[in-house]
């Protein structure tokens, strides 16, 4: 026996079925009455050989109506913490969609690095991305990984700043949350003034930790706390 996600409105004693298929994921958007739905049904054959895609829609959890956002998304798709933006990947780039206007922006087009994990052995039509650390407070920016560093990029793509300096020494920097959020709680915003990083030297195999601190002109600085030889 399998169940579909639904919402029970206690004030009206109505139950709205949010899910329509077992081959989809439903993720409520915190602070709203909407949910992000990734529909896999049209691409089940491709998914069986590791080349899946999904159609992304917004479901209204009050009325049950659905609004299509993007078809055949071959990478990841998620909504920013405040529900303002859809973040998805396409063609080796990160894109945002303003959910109020439905305007889309390629936010990494002019960034002089690659966010694609070219060493992945994935058989999908598009190689996976290195991923993201998350969003900063109030959806001001999304923090995206390349092979070694973190980039702070605004949702309109107009500002892109590398906030670590790992490429020169081939040291991979990745954001880490020391105090994990409890079950069901949203992740804390990426803190570029007090947050922590894990470090790994891809050439030397050394590893350690570092910490962000506030720098000059709004640019954070990174200080190594631990940096150990391979054991």
Regions found by a protein language model. Give the residues of each.
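Beta-propeller folds
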Residues: 1-231
């Amino acid at each position: 026996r399998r169940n579909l996600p639904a919402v029970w409105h206690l004030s009206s004693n109505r139950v709205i079925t949010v899910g329509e298929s077992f081959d989809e994921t439903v993720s409520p958007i915190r602070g709203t009455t909407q949910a992000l739905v990734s529909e896999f049904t049209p691409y089940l054959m491709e998914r069986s050989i590791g080349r899946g895609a999904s159609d992304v829609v917004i479901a209204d959890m009050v009325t049950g109506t659905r609004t299509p956002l993007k078809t055949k998304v071959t990478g990841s798709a998620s909504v920013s913490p405040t529900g303002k933006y859809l973040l998805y990947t396409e063609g080796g780039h990160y894109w945002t969609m303003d959910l109020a206007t439905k305007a889309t922006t390629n936010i990494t087009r002019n960034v002089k690095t690659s966010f694609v994990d070219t060493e992945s052995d994935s058989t999908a039509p598009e190689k996976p991305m290195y991923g993201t650390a998350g969003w900063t407070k109030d959806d001001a920016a999304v923090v995206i990984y390349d092979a070694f560093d973190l980039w702070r990029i605004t949702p309109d793509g107009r500002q892109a700043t590398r906030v670590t300096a790992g490429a020169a020494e081939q040291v991979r920097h990745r954001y880490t949350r020391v105090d994990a959020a409890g079950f069901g709680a949203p992740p804390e915003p990426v803190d570029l003034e007090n947050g922590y990083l894990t470090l790994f030297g891809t050439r030397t195999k050394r590893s350690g930790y570092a910490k962000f601190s506030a720098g000059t002109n709004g640019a954070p600085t990174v200080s190594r706390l631990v940096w150990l030889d391979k054991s």
